[in-house]
C-alpha cells in the first residue's frame, strides 16, 4: 500500500518525479533489507569497519607508490604517469621498460592488496548471503535494475564469442604494429600500445568504408 501511495504521489507531482529513480531503487532493494537494528548497526559502523575505509586505505597506499621512470628520468614517477606511457608511447622498448618498472614497483604491495581484497570481497559475500541475494552479483544487478539472467547472458557471450573477438582484435593489432612500429611479435607490454597509422591518421573515413574495413 505504501509503495502504491508513493507511486501515485510521484505520478501526480512533477516536483516529486525527479525522485522516481531513487524511490524505485529503494523499492527494489526492500525485500533484501535486514532488521532495523541490524541495518542501523551496519550504517553506524560503516565509516570505521566497512569497505569504504579499506578502499580509501588501498587507494591512498597505491597513490604513494613510486616507480622508476622508463624514459630515464632521475625522479621516480607515480603509477598514473607510468601507465600513461604504456598506453601512449609508440616506442616498444620504452613500453617494455615501463611494464618492468611497474612489476618491480608493485613488489611489497602484495600484502596490502591481498588484505584489501579479502576484506572487501569477504564482507560483500557474507552480507549478500545474509540479505538473501541469489548470487554475488545479484545485489549489483538489483541496484542497476538488470535481471540476473541478462547479466549471465552477457558473461556467457564474453566467455564464448568474446574470446574469438579478442583474439581477432589482437591479431589485427599485431599486424598494424608490425607495419607502423616494426614489431615482430606482440608482447605483453604491447597490448595497450597506441595504433599509429602515420600521415593517414587525419583522413576522414565514411561509415560504409569503416564497415567494409571491419568486415574485411
Predicted regions and their residues:
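A well-structured
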Residues: 1-215
